């Protein structure tokens, strides 16, 4: 076996083995939130898979998953007030508990953490801005809004991977 073949085998062994389960969980979480905030049960609309799974740099055994749930713009006024950040996270938690009543779901400072047997998902409700950035809640010191730009990050990783002959993502998986 050549070095190139051994390297390919090594990289293949890093591939996430439970992507179907992860995708199902993402879909169910999205559906629960869409049902609560939009009166639809779509499993794909209004969500972004972010973090290493979203960038396609995650490895087998990944246990920390991240997703953004894009809130309807019409809800901004409901949450852009004193204590609104915590209320948003609590409302997202309650929506998730309707779908997963026996699953451990808790509000953290910035996210709602949903703990499954082999991994957990950090759900971050966000409000989309015009420049592909998102405002997310921070409950510290009474609450504020912070900015994140995951689409730009994911695009940068994808572009660099193309420039590096599809070697960047495999290298990230080894780090």
Where are these regions (language model features)?
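Catalytic cores of NTP-dependent nucleotidyl/adenyl transfer enzymes across multiple folds
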Residues: 23, 30, 101, 106-175
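A short, glycine/Asx- and small/polar-enriched loop/turn
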Residues: 61-65, 117-119
């Amino acid at each position: 076996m050549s070095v190139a073949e051994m390297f390919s085998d090594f990289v293949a062994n890093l591939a996430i083995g439970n992507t179907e389960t992860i995708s199902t969980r993402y879909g169910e979480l999205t559906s629960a939130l869409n049902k609560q905030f939009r009166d639809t049960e779509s499993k794909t609309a209004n969500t972004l898979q972010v973090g290493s799974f979203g960038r396609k740099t995650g490895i087998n055994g990944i246990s920390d998953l991240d997703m953004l749930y894009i809130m309807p713009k019409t809800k901004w006024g409901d949450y852009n007030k004193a204590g609104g950040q915590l209320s948003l996270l609590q409302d997202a938690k309650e929506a998730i508990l309707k779908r997963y009543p026996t699953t451990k779901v808790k509000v953290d400072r910035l996210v709602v953490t949903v703990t499954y047997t082999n991994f957990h998902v950090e759900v971050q409700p966000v409000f989309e801005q015009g420049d592909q950035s998102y405002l997310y809640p921070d409950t510290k010191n009474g609450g504020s809004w912070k900015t994140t730009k995951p689409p730009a990050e994911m695009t940068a990783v994808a572009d660099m991977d193309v420039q590096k002959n599809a070697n960047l993502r495999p290298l990230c998986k080894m780090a």
